[in-house]
Amino acid sequence: MIAALILGLITGSFTGVICYRIPRNESIIFPGSKCDRCAVKIAFYRNIPVFSFLLQHGKCHRCGIKIKRSYFILEILTPVLFLILYFSHGFSIIFFYKAFVYSILLTASFIDIETHIIPDRFFIILLTTGFLYSVLRDNPENWFLGAASYGLPVLLLYSASDFINKEIIGFG
């Protein structure tokens, strides 16, 4: 249980980084976190999920600018979600699969709320993950059924979009 909580805290914090950096076309790995206003590098001990936000009253320790509450919400939601998954599935392949998928969905949702765009990479990651999970878990008939149930509507949307020369649904 403690491991699921810690994994959720770390994942929630990293999800916040992804939500900030992907819309700005920045690397999600380097450089380390910094303040938007004063550009001070955030030391590891000031970057502890949830606790740092609370101890610093949701502000940069140097310049006092408020840190977006959405990052704090992510840092709370993700470990709660991981604990629910842990109590439902234990540390199993299903736990890790669902934790990954839900983390991607949370990330896409928060980016969508901020920018009104869901980058294509999230659809690709979810499709690939779902396919791999299906291959490892299900029988071949389900692979084709899954591919057809996703592929046919997407093919129809792209075809209709080409036919009327207008984007029907945003694909990022």
Each language-model region and where it sits:
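Hydrophobic, membrane-inserted alpha-helices
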Residues: 55-58, 77-85, 103-106, 126-132
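Hydrophobic alpha-helical transmembrane segments and immediately flanking/interface helices
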Residues: 69-78, 95-98, 167
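Functional transmembrane core segments of multi-pass inner-membrane proteins
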Residues: 95, 100-172
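Transmembrane helix-loop-helix
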Residues: 86-97
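Long, highly hydrophobic alpha-helical transmembrane signal-anchor segments
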Residues: 1-23
